[in-house]
């Protein structure tokens, strides 16, 4: 084999490697940017940490019922009664309220912090079948007035959330304002389901 052929082969290999390296580098940059954007969208003004074990609380538990059911959401609040933590959920489509006592040692020892005023909204979007969690107070009122008590109520069979303070209405499936006047969308927390635990955090 002549040196000329070997040289051409090496040149071709180098060219392919250079192109592949450029593509891989571009992908890494894009993934990094999208990860940063996702992180930037997470509300961090008030701490959120919620963990719910669906194996300990199987169906017909309302919170467990949001998994895999597009359009199903719950208001979630926490309280401590006689040393036992309770999770109160209010379902969007019928307003049903459920009180779930967390009676195991593990559940009672873990933190439960629910945003600005002890309330988050969590469920599965009917637009993209993704689990999402929102701050339970009106984002525009939190931003405009300060304080922490601007609760949202279900409307239109649970597809909308309404704030009585500013009269804004939000689409529960993506958090955007759908009433006149516009405004910022609902604040979001990270949310995930790993097959056992429903999580929301920031």
What are these regions (language model features)?
Residues 32-35:
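C-terminal motif of bacterial Sec signal peptides marking the signal peptidase cleavage site
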Residues 145, 157-158, 162:
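Cys/His-rich short segments
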Residues 40-153, 190-202:
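N-terminal pre-ligand scaffold of iron-sulfur
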Residues 37, 139, 164-167:
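Sequence contexts marking disulfide-bonded cysteines in secreted/extracellular proteins
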Residues 29, 131, 156-159:
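Residue-level signal for mature regions of secreted extracellular proteins and peptides
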Residues 3-24:
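Bacterial N-terminal signal peptides that target proteins for export
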Residues 164-202:
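Short Fe-S-cluster ligation motifs
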């Amino acid at each position: 084999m002549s040196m000329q052929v070997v040289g051409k082969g090496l040149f071709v290999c180098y060219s392919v490697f250079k192109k592949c390296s450029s593509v891989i580098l571009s992908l890494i940059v894009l993934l990094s940017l999208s990860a940063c954007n996702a992180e930037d969208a997470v509300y961090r003004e008030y701490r959120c940490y919620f963990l719910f074990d669906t194996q300990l609380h199987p169906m017909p538990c309302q919170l467990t019922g949001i998994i895999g059911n597009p359009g199903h959401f719950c208001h979630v609040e926490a309280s401590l009664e006689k040393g036992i933590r309770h999770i109160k959920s209010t379902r969007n489509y019928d307003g049903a309220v459920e009180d779930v006592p967390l009676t195991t040692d593990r559940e009672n020892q873990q933190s439960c912090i629910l945003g600005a005023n002890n309330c988050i909204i969590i469920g599965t979007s009917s637009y993209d079948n993704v689990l999402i969690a929102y701050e339970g107070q009106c984002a525009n009122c939190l931003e405009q007035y300060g304080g922490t008590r601007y609760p949202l109520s279900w409307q239109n069979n649970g597809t909308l959330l309404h704030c009585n303070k500013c009269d804004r209405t939000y689409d529960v499936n993506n958090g955007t304002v759908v009433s006149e006047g516009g405004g910022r969308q609902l604040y979001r927390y990270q949310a995930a389901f790993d097959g056992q635990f429903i999580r929301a955090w920031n």
